[in-house]
């Protein structure tokens, strides 16, 4: 994992979230609504995440890119909710909770966001939070990511 320096969130995401908050409709399905009904905003979100992360998956650092910009050597970016929507619906459109990750599957083996699923990674800090120190992350030969002891 690398430290991710978050920049300003895309305008479309901010406006959509503020609209949901003001009319009381913010829920875990708000993200899907944003993705499905606001393609321009969703593309802006993907591009912003890709730029901040230098085109790398937030977990394994594999090269990623938004679907429309993907080259043959890159994985398609998936928007990852670091804190899962199932438990933290109020964070589903919070930019600091959104990261870019790879599709997370090699054959039948799941990794990264696909392996994480709806679990909370309490022991692994959000790489976009202040004070994140990449040196505390250890990578095992089997691909496991854990805290350096």
Predicted regions and their residues:
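Short, cysteine/histidine-rich loop/knuckle motifs that typically chelate Zn2+
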Residues: 59-60
